[in-house]
Design a protein with these regions (language model features):
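Conserved, mostly hydrophobic/aromatic
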Residues: 30, 95, 131, 175, ...
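Generic beta-strand/beta-sheet core signal
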Residues: 41, 178, 206, 259-261, ...
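Active-site-proximal beta-alpha core segment in soluble small-molecule metabolic enzymes
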Residues: 2-141
């Protein structure tokens, strides 16, 4: 989640169905920035969080908001709060299907059906508006693509069973999945349930917006190999996020210390990679980083950068780093250019 209002509005202007958030304070910021449709791809739990949500929905009944549920306890909590706050419209809920050893989400379709029935039993305070899953965590399984296809089949089966029992509310229903690794498989295998429901399919590949130079770039290359339509898209997804710093010390041969550290750039997946350099009193434009230069260690405020093939580096040279995992770089900055 970028938490950048200009980027949110650019996405919506370009046709994004909604903005996705993970918690209540992100929701508050979206509302402050005038976002009128939000999907919280998470459960809302805790007295204060549920109360804040109900106040927002009570005071702004036109706000189109969706959240996830994977337990009957949470459903009952939401229903009680909706009743207490006298909401004029029901809280819109998607049942979340998960998988064993995953994250949140009902561990099988039978459990998910119980949650769907509980939502139905709490009308008119709640309304079941669809089903949701997050398949990207299956990337670590021995056969990830097969595991994802099986999971999407279960997601389709859940939607079908809910439709057959008449548990969905009136109006269109939402089917949503699709992390940035496998959204092509979601588009291929996510199917609308039979019946008269109008269906909106929503993929949530949030990292498409900035992409990166490492992890998600590799995921996209794999996607191009397995999907001809993706490979034919030119130029495809390109990295759009760099973090720049300056060489502040060259304490020994082959080593440059750059003033970029863990407080400035993501490191939870991989260390950043130096991509460009610029000497302010010499270069007119940034130059491509010589091969062999790499970050070997990241401290709070500094990066150790091995420069075995380019001894000409000087203190004051600017270095542009490509990143791995945009989300945990965005959260380190209040302003980006």
């Amino acid at each position: 989640t970028t938490m950048a209002p200009q980027l949110f509005h650019r996405q919506l202007e370009d046709g994004a169905w909604a903005i996705t958030v993970a918690n209540i304070h992100q929701l508050r910021l979206c509302r402050h920035w005038g976002i009128n449709r939000v999907l919280m791809a998470n459960q809302v739990v805790g007295y204060q969080n549920i109360s804040d949500l109900c106040l927002e929905l009570r005071d702004n009944p036109e706000f189109d908001f969706y959240l996830l549920a994977d337990s009957c306890q949470n459903v009952d909590q939401l229903a009680e709060a909706a009743k207490t706050y006298g909401l004029s419209k029901p809280i819109q809920i998607l049942v979340e299907l998960g998988f064993p050893d995953g994250r949140t989400g009902c561990r099988n379709t039978d459990l998910a059906l119980e949650v769907a029935r509980r939502i139905k039993s709490n009308e008119p305070y709640l309304i079941l508006k669809g089903v949701e899953g997050y398949e990207a965590l299956l990337r670590t399984r021995p056969e990830p693509e097969d595991s994802i296809r099986i999971f999407l089949k279960d997601l389709n089966l859940l939607a079908e069973k809910i439709a057959l029992e008449g548990l969905f509310g009136q109006g269109e229903i939402i089917l949503t999945a699709g992390g940035s690794d496998f959204f092509d498989l979601v588009l291929e295998h996510l199917e609308a349930p039979s019946g008269r429901h109008e269906v909106v399919k929503v993929i949530r590949s949030g990292c498409y917006l900035t992409h990166d130079s490492l992890a998600f770039n590799r995921f996209f290359e794999k996607m191009k190999h397995r999907n001809d339509k993706v490979s034919q898209a030119s130029p495809g997804l390109l990295p759009a996020l760099q973090v720049w710093g300056a060489v502040q010390s060259i304490p020994e041969s082959g080593l440059a210390i750059v003033n970029v550290g863990k407080r400035d750039v993501s490191y939870d997946v991989e260390l950043p990679i130096p991509e460009m350099y610029f000497r302010p009193d010499k270069d007119q434009f940034p130059q491509k980083m010589p091969e062999g230069c790499k970050v070997t260690l990241l401290h709070d405020q500094h990066a150790n950068m091995a420069v075995p093939t380019f001894p000409e580096f000087q203190v004051g040279d600017m270095i542009g780093f490509g990143i791995s995992h945009p989300c945990t770089t965005f959260d380190k900055w209040r302003l980006m250019y």
